[in-house]
A protein has these predicted regions:
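Short beta-strand to alpha-helix junction loop
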Residues: 64, 98-108, 147-167, 295-303
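Glycine-rich FAD pyrophosphate-binding loop
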Residues: 24-45
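Helical element adjacent to the flavin cofactor pocket in flavoenzyme catalytic cores
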Residues: 147-205, 209
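Beta1/beta-strand and adjacent pyrophosphate-binding region of the FAD-binding site
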Residues: 2-15, 31
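Flavin (FAD/FMN) cofactor-binding core of flavoprotein oxidoreductases
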Residues: 129-133, 154, 288, 301-379, ...
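Dinucleotide-binding Rossmann-like beta1-alpha1 core, especially the glycine-rich loop
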Residues: 49-134
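Active-site substrate-recognition segment that forms the wall
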Residues: 20-25, 81-87, 200-201, 205, ...
Length: 393
């Protein structure tokens, strides 16, 4: 039957496109369903670039995921002849007097250094003087501690998703777009039914990677584990010294300038030349939103506030006359880590909310692990740290 498969993947963003590709690669009859036409700009996997780094300050349990993901990105580049992953280095820095919680860590730079040492990841530890000498683009306070990882860089999220979806289709996978999954139900004979706004589909296993819509599919029992926050991505023009911001001279960065969550800045080099500007943004967790009713327009006052408080004081060459801006949704768990687990009442349905604002770099490995789970193969990475029961055991 056309609507029956071995596996159904609900949501084809970062994790879902990876799972669909891996399942098709393994010869599975797989159907993927997405409410939009990915890659799209309605969820969490858009905006031209995503930082990737091997030493993970959020916890050592993430490092094997990103290491395996990097291998898969290379495989995808070879298979598609597309540039997906650029290693131009990453600088992570913070004042040593700052101890606020950022991505679940109160000592993010130090935790990153520890992870690098534990896993043998090439890196340098820099003081403020050395950071200033190498990267005069930053206005420092003088007591910063820096971590530089030459093998880090950025991914092209839309290209990564598109590459995996195209390969999945070529390998026999089916990607159904502009169709909304409404309900997932266990059937009496051991199959799982996925009901959409158009059809009903059935499979032995279902993978739910629905991003900010995940709790709407899983139900009220799971809703409090997933808080959705609206984020703003901004591209600012360079007023001067354009040559200092090329990927060859300016790394991706994470800069913690204060104790509040919104004091974590991140950004990228001018990947499209001076006219493309710099993508620099912060993270905000002021209020949760409904993904179906979130304001998508970014106001001038939002941009002005971000620039005046965070961008202008720290980047003297960046102008406040922003080029463009868009919104992005973060799905955040209680401990800012991932949740990857099966349903309590359905061992043949696995869900992955692998985001919390730092998920894309891990998505290729998680997609592979989800595919291996669905086909009952041994996993290459350990997903046990991301089980839901950690919140009550």
């Amino acid at each position: 039957m056309a609507n029956t498969a071995d596996v159904i993947v609900v949501g084809l963003g970062a994790m879902g496109s990876a799972a669909l590709y891996q399942l098709a690669k393994l010869g599975s009859r797989v159907i993927g369903i997405d409410r939009f036409n990915p890659p799209h700009d309605q969820g969490s996997s858009h905006g031209d670039t995503r930082i990737t780094r091997e030493a993970i300050g959020e916890g050592g349990e993430f490092v094997p995921l990103v290491l395996r993901s990097n291998q898969i990105w290379e495989e995808l580049e070879a298979a598609t002849d597309r540039s997906l992953h650029t290693r131009n280095g990453a600088l992570i820095l913070a004042s040593q007097s700052i101890h606020g919680d950022h991505h679940g860590s109160t000592s993010f730079v130090e935790d990153t250094i520890r992870a690098a040492r534990e896993f043998g990841i090439a890196h340098e530890v820099l003081d403020a003087g050395e950071i200033r000498r190498r990267h005069p683009q930053f206005t420092l306070s003088g007591d910063e501690l820096g971590y530089f990882e030459s093998g880090a860089g950025f991914l092209r999220p839309e290209a990564c998703i598109e590459a995996q979806l195209n390969l999945a289709r070529q390998l026999g996978g089916k990607a159904i777009t502009s169709e909304t999954a409404l309900d997932i139900q266990q059937e009496k004979h051991g199959m799982v039914e996925v009901k959409t706004d158009r059809e009903r589909y059935s499979a032995a296993r279902v993978i739910v990677t629905a991003g900010p819509w995940i709790s709407k599919l899983l139900g009220a029992e799971y809703a409090h584990y997933f808080q959705i926050y609206r984020q703003v991505l901004c591209w600012f023009p360079l007023a001067r010294n354009h040559e200092q911001y090329s990927p060859e001279r300016f790394p991706v960065f994470i800069w913690i300038v204060g104790d509040r969550p919104c004091d974590m800045l991140y950004g990228f080099p001018a990947i499209d030349g001076p006219r493309g500007g710099l993508k620099i943004s912060t993270e905000r967790y002021d209020a949760t939103v409904d993904p179906d009713a979130v304001p998508r327009t970014v106001s001038d006052s939002e941009i002005a506030a971000m620039y005046n408080e965070h961008i202008g004081p720290h980047f003297p060459d960046v102008s406040g006359d922003y080029l463009h801006a868009t919104t992005c949704l973060y799905t955040v768990t209680p401990d800012a880590k991932f949740i990857v687990d099966t349903l309590r009442d359905g061992e043949n349905v696995m869900f992955a909310s692998a985001c919390s604002g730092h998920g894309f770099k891990h998505s290729a490995a998680i997609g592979e692990a989800l595919a291996f789970w669905a086909l009952e193969r041994p996993l290459r990475v350990d997903l046990s740290p991301f089980r839901l029961d950690r919140f009550w055991r």
